[in-house]
Amino acid sequence: TTALISLGSLLLLVCDGGRALPEPQACGVVPEAWRFDCYPERGVVVTRELCEARNCCFIPASSSPPALGRNGVPWCFYPPGFPSYSLVSVNATDLGQTGTLVKTVKTYYPKDILTLQLGLLYETDNRLRVRITDPSESRFEVPIAVPKATEKASSPAYSVELSNEPFGIIVKRTSTGAVLLNTTVAPLFYCDQFLQLSSSLSSQYIYGLGEHRSSFLHDIHWNTLTMWARDVATSSLLPDHDSILYPLTNLYGVHPFYLAMDEGGTGTAHGFFLLNSNAMDVVLQPGPAITWRTIGGILDFYVFLGPDPTSVIGQYLEVVGYPAMPVYWALGYHLCRWGYGSSNATWDVVKNMRNYGIPQDVQWNDIDYMDRSLDFTFDPTAFSTLPDMVKDLHSHGQRYVMMLDPGISSVQPEGGYWPYDEGLRRGVFINHTDGSTLIGKVWPGLTAFPDFSDDVTHEWWYDNLKRFHDKVPFDGLWIDMNEPSSFVDGSTVGCPDTELENPPYTPGETHTHLSHLTSSHYNMHSLYGLLEAKASCPEAYVRKRAFVISRSTFPSQGQYSGHWLGDNRSHWKDMYTSIAGMLTFNLLGVPLVGADICGFSEQTEEELCVRWTQLGAFYPFTRNHNSIDQKPQDPPAFSPAARSAMKQSLLLRSSLFPLLYTLFHRAHTHGHTVARPLLFEFPKDVRTYGIDRQFLWGKSLMVTPVLDPGVDYVVGYFPQGLWYDYYTGDSIRSKGEELRLKAPLEHINLHLREGAVIPTQRPNTTLFVSSGQPLHLVSSLSEDGSAGGELFWDDGESIDTFETDQYAHVVFTVVKVPGSTNTITFTSSLPIASYITVETASFYGVKMEPTRVMVNSHDAAFTYRANQVRLGVRSQRLSVF
């Protein structure tokens, strides 16, 4: 049972020099786990005098000093009864309730807003929205489209209780009475540049809150997660000492959403989303409790009731938008590096991949393809053959992706650089308050930054893309440095000494001023990557589905782009943490995600690169990328044995493309995850809650990679049930236990959960070729002989095929016919698409050798191996309808 400490109890006061101080006995009743920090400013040694000047309790913590990246138990904390808002009126509305909040005692932060408007919106049976706003003055609200409820939920899965004095909101799950949100645990702050909301958590099991380097399951023991989009190489954040994980510093994206499992292993889950784009700190403490501190905007948040984890994510994505359906080749193998040096050197790598028969769908170039790092150019000398290379890629069914940065050079001769000249003419750049163009510094030198919140900028950006596409017919875009990043503080003239630049509280993003590496647009800063992605979708000029990979992300990003996890290192630890990043972004609605395979910085090692390629074959987005001046790490650069192991991993991925494509369809239409944590499928198994060394594709295919050097085995957890080795069909009946699995260097362990049918196909070196191959179906039978699965299929690149019914949806069902132990009926349903055929099928879990196998009433050849309980059917190609 979670103990909640309400600050609504009586406050005993004593006088000390004219200040009202809390009575020591009142301070002593607050357990350490429920101390909410009254002096959160960084870089300050908090003394008793400073603390008591805020009328707060000061008690040194009993525990030892905190570890790196943690705050530790606060010594200065709010006493019971600390002044907060009061709820003075409540009225019913068509959608819920509205109320007025009043504060009579000002806080220690400037510009308190003393009267607030409360809005409770019962939007659906599983979604509650709460808005706390300033009724007298408009404040910034995040400009992303969210659904507008038109009627109040009729049978909500939640109840809402309001505390009048102090004001607080308590949200409970009606089916169990579990408390999901209780904001009475600490005072509410609502100042012009400081908003703070605290709440209890339903358990210690909390996920999401990107983007940071951490384990998938967050540690709630005094961790602070800062959210403010920032250009920082993750490789610079990773200490080598094994006893330390990672400082939870803020990275490229901002995602103020969490999923929490309810207490007690009930399997129920809920979600919370704060729709705010300003810089913020999110503090986790062992109460369990959470505090949100932000320096602008409003408090606009949602509670999602689930009740299971998959439903929570679907409900969250109903608000911010389902991810786009990717173009088919986006799911192939991508190859890149910074420092190819020339188009011919790039081309040679592609040719080597072909010579060795290693799958490759997409070739990329980093910034070195540009002429003097200028966007929308290519080096006329070193990359003179770039158009020819792209033409060659297209002739082989391959694609080309290039990098773009948002910074536009501002120092080229007038009339000599159309992007800047035309941008200046149209007024698309971010300005100083005096109307002059804000100038920063990025790779090409002094630069101006497009204002992607303006539709005029979108038109200018499109014109630039179209002009360049006419010269180099690229197929997708890699948008980088879009936090946005600048190499100078704010601009070349620095930052003004104003209240805006010096807020009373600065979230901890490790720099002295928030203007570092950014311009000073607090409200819009963390939205920049999202807005650029919206402007960058090349559908209009390639007339196919867009492919965009963005470094900076924000809620709703999945509608417009995928994401790679940033500049990692060629270290085993980095490979491990990539799984947590991949799973987290699947929760956040950006399923097209992956890390730089083999590592971006530092020299990779052959064993590491083999193991990472095996893992990377199961990233939803799989790309090998490394830095300038590092040795090559494309597969042909390694020994024959390593090269062969990498090739087999990539062929394996290619063979599983029908499954992966179908999973992305489910993500696009239902908000499902593609790469999925085990807890989503086994929410009542508490042992799955912390697993981030294994994961699932969809419901049924479990991946157990090797993440440590020098081993030929791996330990994996198998939830209760029947599992089959994907390669052999050998069965494992687990009670919910860890098992040691053989894992020689050329092998990655895959297991199928009982009751699945997954579609596969014969692999090839490009998805353009392999996607036309007949299907091979793999069925893993349950104890009762049943299994099921599906296939979504279309042309792979046309826009809105699902919305316009230009697709096939096949449902596979395996059942045991009553009265027979050896007969299996295989059925499917399909509205169109006679071009889909099934060539072979395998059934794992057939306990007795059949005497006869028939397909469409005709005898079919088969093989049976009792030690593998596998049935293979080979016949004439079978049309699935």
Summary of predicted features, one role per range:
Residues T1-L11:
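Classical eukaryotic N-terminal signal peptides for Sec-dependent ER targeting/secretion
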Residues R19-R48:
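Secreted, propeptide-processed cysteine-rich mini-domains
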Residues L21-V30, C76-Y85, V90, G177-E754, ...:
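Catalytic-domain carbohydrate-binding cleft regions of carbohydrate-active enzymes
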Residues P40, L50, N55-N71, W75-Y78:
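Extracellular Cys-Trp
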Residues F82-T100, D112-S155:
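A low-complexity, Ser/Thr/Gly/Pro-enriched, surface-exposed linker/loop concept
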Residues Q97-L101, L120, V130-I132, A157, ...:
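Short, well-ordered beta-strand segments enriched in hydrophobic/aromatic residues
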Residues A145-P147, Y726-L745, R852-S875:
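Solvent-exposed beta-strand/loop surfaces of large extracellular or lumenal domains
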Residues I244-L245, H747, L752-H858, G872-R877:
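Accessory, solvent-exposed terminal regions and/or long lumenal/extracellular loops of proteins
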